[in-house]
Amino acid sequence: MAIGTSLLYDGLVVGGSIQVFEDIGTVRVIAFGGVGNPGACRAQLDELIGLINPTLLDVSFEIDLVLQMPACRAVVRVDESATQEDVAADVIRTLGSVTANFAAVAPAFLAITADNKSVNEALSLVRIPEGAKKSLIGGES
């Protein structure tokens, strides 16, 4: 089962997917959006993602093989004793986190795919939200 989302976040339309894997007790949450043609710039995007991922705690970026575009993802582990409300709250919180992280990094993806900027130039465009925690693109806790 998958639930699709579409959110307007900081002026950017970000799509999302919530996929439940009941057999293994996890929910995969991803956020993605249109950031140009990633196929033509795959090496630079991989390098950018390689620089960003080590700074993150709860989420990670990848080039999604199905979507063929950058995506931010996280996994919610479902405790058997958790209530449905607790699981729903964790999933919604995680969707917010992956969406915020994707929106923060989207300008860097666009700098590479649309403006042919270098990886270092693109990295300087990552927008860290004011007062963000480390799980939101390396901010302070």
Language-model-detected regions and their locations in the chain:
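Short, highly charged C-terminal tails/helix-capping segments
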Residues: P107-S141
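Well-ordered alpha/beta subsegment
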Residues: I63-G96, A103-A111
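Ser/Thr-rich, low-complexity intrinsically disordered terminal regions
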Residues: M1-V14
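Short, internal acidic amphipathic alpha-helical interface segments
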Residues: F32-M69
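Beta-strand elements of well-folded, non-transmembrane domains
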Residues: Y9-G11, V35, V76-E80
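Intrinsically disordered, low-complexity regulatory segments enriched in Ser/Thr/Pro
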Residues: S17-G39
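Hydrophobic residues embedded in beta-strands of well-ordered beta-sheets
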Residues: M1-I3, G25-V27, Q68-P70
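A generic beta-sheet turn/junction motif
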Residues: Y9-G11, E22, L65
